[in-house]
Each structure stands twice: as structure tokens, then as C-alpha cells.
């Protein structure tokens, strides 16, 4: 057990040093202090101090959580820059790949550590959800930008297809980390709408947004990638080298999109009706799916 803990601590420390060097580079390039970079750097400094203690006494879960929070802040700064610049065509593919790799490291390390029975669950469900959400949302924003570039689409719709599949998989992964709450006589809820949401696996507004994002990405896939060999896209979902899957999967854009958007509309017009979520776009996409089916 001690050897396993020491191994995790060493690996987290190495990753933390790499991230700190990257933050230094970003700060120098920006030429000004940024709140997210400052917070990320502070977390990594604390991580470094904790890793300097006796490794056998360190809590690997706390260390990995600190590292994860730093990565989330650091990559958020870079994502905002890409969005503000509308994903420049020359550098965005490599930059998105780097960001996905950073956001995948905590999950990869947690999975490797889970091979040791006493190191299971190093990252809680909420952090794992956040990592998947951030990767899926990044690819959503990137694909949204790409769908507005007609010449690029004519040349590289196969790349869009791969980006979409990876993004959808990340969002579906995020939605499936926690099981829906089973409602029974032993569980009491003062708010019936909250109970309905939890029973469908919707735990936050981000879960609702993830459903809309994944449905919209399925729409883009069906609209822009129909010149591919089949509407059932069997692709290598390890597009950027740090995907949530490392094998070939079949993803039917229409089937997946229809299922997730029907749930989105049901939730928004049911338990979330008072919050006035917009369902017009979702219904238009569902109509598009029906036309493609007939």
C-alpha cells in the first residue's frame, strides 16, 4: 500500500511541476495577472508543499483534487482565449488537443490508481463530471465555430465527425457518472419537482445544458457529415490522443440526438418549467431528425 501511495504522489508531483511551468509561460505571454492563473498557481504551490512531506503519510486523494482544481482553472483561461478569438484555424487543432490532454490527466491517473483496491475513488463523481463536461463543452464550442466555415467543411467534414463523436461521448459520460435517485417510500422530498429531476439523473443546470449540447452536436453530425459512408459512424474516438475511449465505437447521430433531446424537452417543460429553459431549438432539431427518418 505504501509503495502505491508513493507512486501516486510522485506522479501527481511531476504533473504539477509541468502544469506550473505551463502557467508561467501563459502568464508571461498574457503580460498581465489573471485570476484563474493565479488561483491555479497557488493550488500547485500548495500541492508542491504537500508532496514534499513524507510520501507514505500523504493523502493521494487530496493531492489529486488539488491538481485537478489547478488544471480546471488553467485550462479555463486558455479556453476563454480560444473562444474570444473564435478558434483561429492555424493553431486551434493543436491547442484543443493540448487542453484535452491536460483535462484528461487527472482521470487517467485516477483510473491507474484504481487498480490498487485501497486507492479506489481518488476523484469523486463531481470532479469527474466536471472534467468530462469541460472536455465535451470545449469540443462543442470548437465544433460550433467549425460549422460556420463552409470551405473548411467541404474539405474536412471527416474531422468534424471525429470531433463531434468525441465531444458527444464526453458529455454522455458526464451525464452517466451518477445513477438516478430511486424514489421510494423511504426517501422523502419536500419539492416534488426536485425529486423528479433526481430520478431522471439531472443533478444540476450543467446536466441540462449537457443534454442540449450533445443533441445539437448530433444535429451537426447528421447535417454536415452525411457524405460519409454511413449514418452509423464507426470512428476512432481517440481523436486527440486523450479521449474518454480508446477503441472504435458506433454512434448513430440521429438515434442518440433524438433520445437526449426528448429527455431535455421533457425535463425543461416538466420539473424545470418555472425556470423557462428554451426548448424551441431542441424541437426544431427533433423535427429535423424525424424528416431524416422518414
Curated annotation (Swiss-Prot):
<keyword id="KW-0007">Acetylation</keyword>
<protein>
    <recommendedName>
        <fullName>RAB7A-interacting MON1-CCZ1 complex subunit 1</fullName>
    </recommendedName>
</protein>
<dbReference type="GO" id="GO:0005654">
    <property type="term" value="C:nucleoplasm"/>
</dbReference>
<feature type="modified residue" description="N-acetylalanine">
    <location>
        <position position="2"/>
    </location>
</feature>
<comment type="function">
    <text>Plays an important role in the removal of damaged mitochondria via mitophagy by controlling the stability and localization of RAB7A. Required for the recruitment of RAB7A and ATG9A vesicles to damaged mitochondria and promotes the stability of RAB7A by inhibiting its proteasomal degradation during mitophagy.</text>
</comment>
<dbReference type="GO" id="GO:0005829">
    <property type="term" value="C:cytosol"/>
</dbReference>
<keyword id="KW-0963">Cytoplasm</keyword>
<dbReference type="GO" id="GO:0000423">
    <property type="term" value="P:mitophagy"/>
</dbReference>
<keyword id="KW-0072">Autophagy</keyword>
<dbReference type="InterPro" id="IPR037657">
    <property type="entry name" value="RIMC1"/>
</dbReference>
<comment type="subunit">
    <text>Interacts with the MON1A-CCZ1B complex. Interacts with GDP-bound RAB7A and promotes its interaction with the MON1A-CCZ1B complex.</text>
</comment>
<dbReference type="Pfam" id="PF17716">
    <property type="entry name" value="RIMC1"/>
</dbReference>
<comment type="similarity">
    <text>Belongs to the RIMOC1 family.</text>
</comment>
Amino acid at each position: 500500500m505504501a509503495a502505491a501511495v508513493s507512486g501516486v504522489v510522485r506522479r501527481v508531483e511531476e504533473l504539477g511541476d509541468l502544469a506550473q511551468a505551463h502557467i508561467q509561460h501563459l502568464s508571461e505571454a498574457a503580460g498581465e495577472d489573471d485570476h484563474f492563473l493565479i488561483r491555479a498557481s497557488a493550488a500547485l504551490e500548495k500541492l508542491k508543499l504537500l508532496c514534499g512531506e513524507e510520501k507514505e503519510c500523504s493523502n493521494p486523494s487530496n493531492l489529486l483534487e488539488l491538481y485537478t482544481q489547478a488544471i480546471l482553472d488553467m485550462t479555463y483561461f486558455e479556453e476563454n482565449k480560444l473562444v474570444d478569438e473564435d478558434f483561429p484555424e492555424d493553431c486551434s487543432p493543436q491547442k484543443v488537443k493540448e487542453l484535452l490532454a491536460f483535462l484528461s490527466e487527472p482521470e487517467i491517473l485516477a483510473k491507474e490508481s484504481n487498480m490498487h483496491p485501497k486507492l479506489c475513488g481518488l476523484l469523486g463523481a463531481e470532479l469527474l463530471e466536471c472534467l468530462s463536461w469541460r472536455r465535451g463543452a470545449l469540443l462543442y464550442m470548437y465544433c460550433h465555430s467549425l460549422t460556420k466555415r463552409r470551405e473548411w467543411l467541404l474539405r474536412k467534414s471527416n474531422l468534424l465527425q471525429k470531433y463531434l463523436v468525441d465531444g458527444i461521448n464526453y458529455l454522455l459520460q458526464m451525464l452517466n457518472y451518477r445513477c438516478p435517485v430511486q424514489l421510494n417510500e423511504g426517501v422523502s422530498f419536500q419539492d416534488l419537482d426536485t425529486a423528479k429531476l433526481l430520478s431522471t439523473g439531472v443533478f444540476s443546470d450543467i446536466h441540462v445544458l449537457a443534454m442540449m449540447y450533445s443533441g445539437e452536436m448530433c444535429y451537426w453530425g447528421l447535417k454536415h457529415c452525411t457524405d460519409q459512408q454511413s449514418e452509423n459512424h464507426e470512428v476512432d474516438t481517440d481523436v486527440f490522443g486523450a479521449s474518454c475511449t480508446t477503441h472504435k465505437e458506433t454512434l448513430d447521430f440521429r438515434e442518440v440526438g433524438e433520445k437526449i433531446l426528448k429527455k431535455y424537452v421533457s425535463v425543461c417543460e416538466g420539473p424545470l418549467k418555472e425556470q423557462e429553459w428554451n426548448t424551441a431549438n431542441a424541437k426544431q432539431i427533433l423535427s429535423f431528425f424525424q424528416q431524416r427518418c422518414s
